[in-house]
């Protein structure tokens, strides 16, 4: 087996449990997140609900920025180069870039879900926010351990967003009636 094939298999081995966990969490979101107070059934309340849950991705990004900022004052990173000598700082910068991208994509998806989901299904947004936060943490820790170790966290954070885009696109462009 080639080293490349081995890395692919390790990535798949990390991604599969994330797929199962995401599917189970979203399937049982009503039970797991039944304690969450749903908003009034009007567009502004729905969007405010989604925005409040965007704090979890925001905190993930803020944590990465704070860690990178603190690491920027150590001797091997004080010059501010894009490729610092510190492996940990380089991974943190990559985490921040990817978290920024994922946060933007999630925000667009969740705003669309907030407007289009039936009110009882809005509980999916807190479920996705929780998966996002756990996934970003697992991505960061896994990446620090070994690059292919980031697969579980990447899939756990990204899969609900991808599914959201698919559902919203289907609804918007295929004329799925209410």
Segments from the language model and where they lie:
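Small-residue-rich segments of transmembrane alpha-helices in multi-pass membrane proteins
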Residues: 17-20, 87-90, 153-168
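Transmembrane alpha-helical segments of integral membrane proteins
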Residues: 34, 128-144
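Long, highly hydrophobic alpha-helical transmembrane signal-anchor segments
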Residues: 1-59
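Core segments of transmembrane alpha-helices
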Residues: 57-58, 97-110
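Short membrane-interface loop/juxtamembrane segments of multi-pass integral membrane proteins
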Residues: 80-103
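Juxtamembrane boundary at the C-terminal end of a transmembrane helix
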Residues: 166-178
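Membrane-helix interface/capping segments
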Residues: 36-39, 62-86
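Interfacial loop-to-transmembrane junctions
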Residues: 6-7, 138-163
């Amino acid at each position: 087996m080639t080293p490349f094939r081995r890395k692919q298999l390790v990535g798949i081995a990390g991604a599969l449990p994330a797929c199962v966990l995401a599917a189970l969490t979203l399937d049982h979101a009503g039970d797991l997140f039944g304690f969450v107070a749903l908003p009034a059934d009007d567009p502004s309340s729905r969007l405010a609900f989604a925005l409040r849950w965007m704090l979890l991705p925001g905190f993930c990004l803020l944590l990465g920025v704070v860690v990178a900022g603190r690491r920027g004052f150590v001797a091997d990173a004080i010059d501010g180069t894009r490729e610092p000598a510190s492996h940990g700082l380089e991974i943190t910068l990559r985490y921040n870039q990817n978290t920024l991208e994922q946060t933007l994509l999630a925000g667009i998806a969740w705003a669309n879900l907030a407007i289009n989901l039936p009110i009882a299904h809005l509980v999916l947004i807190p479920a996705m926010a929780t998966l996002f936060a756990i996934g970003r943490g697992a991505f960061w820790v896994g990446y620090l351990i070994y690059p292919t170790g980031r697969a579980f966290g990447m899939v756990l954070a990204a899969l609900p967003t991808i599914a959201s885009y698919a559902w919203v696109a289907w609804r918007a462009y295929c004329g799925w009636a209410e």
